[in-house]
Amino acid sequence: FASPFMVGINERWGTWFAYRVAVLADTDFEPTRPVPGESPCTACRPRPCVSACPGKAIESDEFNLANCVRYRLRADSACQTTCMARLACPVRAEHRYDDEQIRHAYAISLRFIEQYQTGKT
């Protein structure tokens, strides 16, 4: 399932899991079926992730990637090396990555955004 801030979310891990790899192969294997159920976000109120997003990337039930990127690129951004919306998500918060791991992952994604913006990919 996708969270309002477009990070995967599930009932067991919340947003604190990572997709590692996708393999494309010409085989006869059946694709894995999606996990049945409903997104934990469906019943979440008052949706603390929405109010925690300083970049106003989550409004009117839609994620605005341009707002997210614009805010992350600001020199004074609170989201350069983290995501305030993700930190505010109450679903399985006990699985939250430690601060060093969060800073590491978000620093890499910020570097990719900067490279994309400047055309230096």
Could you say what each language-model-derived stretch is?
Residues 1-119:
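Catalytic cores of enzyme domains
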